[in-house]
């Protein structure tokens, strides 16, 4: 994941990239071959995949939620497919937000489950059948799995972070790419550039040259009220914590202290005690992300949670019609798939 990834992945290529290039070539060949030859089970419902070209966080979860909301506005019954993070179930498991913890199902599925049923399993096809048969879903949104899922995808929306782009442009282990861009673009239906920055410009141009539509969106706090004028100790265990810190600043909050943690981090009692003590001593308000709050829900004291502010965010598309277009094109592709049998 991004925060555990070597920093050189996000810098100009150097001797380490050169040294790892033979391994990257082997990985790239295997990954490309795997994507081309994968047997993908066809599901009796439209499947929209929210993926990314690289390892790590690009803001897929808020995008998946925004598109689920759009599907509901179009009178569809969406359901989410997720493999979870660290969760392990022999059979597909539908998330129960009242009883499941992030340790069991992952933090992202807990966030998704506030909006639609979520099936957690590495076997996306089995999860899909569960959502269709038992939960009445008629539109499936897959959170990640773009490269690996053994399920037919009707529309693949690939999310690229404008600030980080595709890093040094090399394939694992020399860089963050999960496969060569040319191999991944074959399976890409549309590209979504998230946020401000120029790091993604080259891959956006490459996608545009390949005839893929380019969309743009950004993250906004759900409510900016309450942040202005406050001094915060902000902490986060996500792919790129700096993005969260910037969002707090942009919403008018003053960041006196920041504490980044690894992606999907489970906080120990002494870490939470240190955060609380520092905030108290400095007269600061603790603030974190919705993902971190999902992990803390069953792992922190109620007293800590009561004093914690959580920054809820929304994905805002630069053009209002884009979410409806993506859902429509997913439905169109599914109808074409059914006609072909």
Language model segments and positions:
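C-terminal accessory "lid"/substrate-recognition subdomains
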Residues: 2-10, 165-285, 337-341
């Amino acid at each position: 994941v991004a925060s555990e990834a070597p920093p050189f992945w996000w810098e100009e290529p150097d001797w380490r990239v050169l040294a790892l290039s033979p391994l990257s070539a082997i990985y790239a060949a295997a990954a490309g071959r795997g994507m081309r030859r994968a047997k993908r089970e066809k599901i009796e419902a439209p499947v929209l995949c929210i993926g990314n070209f690289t390892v790590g966080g690009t803001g897929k979860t808020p995008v998946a939620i925004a598109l689920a909301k759009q599907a509901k506005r179009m009178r569809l019954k969406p359901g989410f497919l997720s493999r979870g993070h660290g969760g392990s179930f022999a059979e597909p498991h539908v998330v129960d937000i009242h009883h499941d913890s992030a340790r069991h199902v992952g933090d992202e599925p807990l966030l998704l489950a506030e909006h639609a049923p979520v099936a957690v399993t590495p076997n996306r096809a089995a999860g899909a059948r569960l959502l269709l048969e038992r939960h009445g879903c008629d539109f499936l949104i897959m959170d990640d799995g773009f490269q690996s899922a053994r399920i037919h995808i009707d529309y693949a929306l690939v999310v690229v972070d404008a600030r980080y782009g595709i890093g040094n442009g090399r394939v694992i282990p020399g860089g963050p790419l999960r496969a060569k861009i040319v191999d991944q673009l074959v399976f890409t239906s549309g590209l979504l550039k998230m946020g401000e920055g120029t790091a993604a410009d080259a891959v956006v141009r490459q996608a545009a040259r390949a005839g893929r539509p380019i969309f743009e969106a950004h993250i906004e706090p759900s409510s900016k009220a309450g942040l202005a004028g406050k001094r915060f100790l902000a902490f986060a265990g996500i792919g790129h914590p700096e993005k969260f810190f910037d969002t707090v600043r942009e919403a008018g909050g003053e960041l006196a202290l920041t504490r980044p943690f690894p992606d999907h981090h489970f906080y120990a009692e002494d870490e939470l005690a240190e955060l609380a003590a520092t905030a108290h001593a400095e007269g600061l308000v603790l603030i974190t992300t919705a993902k971190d709050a999902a992990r803390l829900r069953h792992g922190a004291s109620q007293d800590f949670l009561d004093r914690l502010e959580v920054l809820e965010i929304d994905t805002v598309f630069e053009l209002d019609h884009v979410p409806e277009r993506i859902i429509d094109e997913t439905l169109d592709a599914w109808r074409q798939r059914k006609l072909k049998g």
